[in-house]
Amino acid sequence: MAEFPASLLILNGKSTDNLPLREAIMLLREEGMTIHVRVTWEKGDAARYVEEARKLGVATVIAGGGDGTINEVSTALIQCEGDGIPALGILPLGTANDFATSVGIPEALDKALKLAIAGNAIAIDMAQVNKQTCFINMATGGFGTRITTETPEKLKAALGGVSYIIHGLMRMDTLQPDRCEIRGENFHWQGDALVIGIGNGRQAGGGQQLCPNALINDGLLQLRIFTGDEILPALVSTLKSDEDNPNIIEGASSWFDIQAPHEITFNLDGEPLSGQNFHIEILPAALRCRLPPDCLLLR
């Protein structure tokens, strides 16, 4: 194998007992690759490890975990200043792995690891909420957010993405739509939202294609709203094609403002953020990410 610059893997603490991963890393090290490994224990570790990675002079920081780990590492990378900022590599090890799946990261650990180290680094967008919190994949609100936030960890560990659907069916009788107003470039809507998806990426909640037209390097956010006064009829209506579905509202903009008369919660790559006012904007070409050549989310 050709010689490649060093990488630093930031591994979610839940994945430390992954024997196939350990074997894949050892094999690549035997082939001559320099791979540093750091394990997260608490929030803030990823940012510290990214700073360490810069001091080590590595070419890539690999996020080993789910969407939340990718979010933490990518957020730390875009906050770096100066030259020589490492690219982002992705090693999907989470429950749903929505971002990794949608951009075409291989499921096989050895192939994903090689891509993370040797893949082509492409400039991609990120999004920022209220000038503070960032997301690389999607912000979701409404029914879907409450389900992903409330689904028990043991259920997620046992069933993966299917756990969200099961928990949602169990909670259906207690959930109500969120009333809100959303504005963007040439866009304005007000009403009851069952689900809100604002995507840099395309899917969330364990494989649900909420924003099927989203691209990660077009400088735009894709918006999709599933409307409805009652949960079950609205869910049934989503089985129709988009063209015939009056319960689906779509838009595209470099920013969206959301206001609600009551507190609502958005899920940002797995992390909840509650409030009544949200300003969400795209950050064009915010970082470089190592992606497969056939990635469907590139223009």
Swiss-Prot record:
Positions of the catalytic residues: 271 (proton acceptor)
Binding, ATP: 40, 66-72, 95
Domain DAGKc: residue ranges: 2-133
One Pfam family matching this protein: YegS_C
GO molecular-function terms, A-Z: ATP binding; lipid kinase activity; magnesium ion binding
Record has Cytoplasm as a keyword: yes
Cofactor note: Binds 1 Mg(2+) ion per subunit. Ca(2+) may be able to substitute.
GO term, biological process aspect, one: phospholipid biosynthetic process
Main location: cytoplasm
EC number: 2.7.1.-
Binding site for Mg(2+): 215, 218, 220
Function text: Probably phosphorylates lipids; the in vivo substrate is unknown.
Name of the protein: Probable lipid kinase YegS
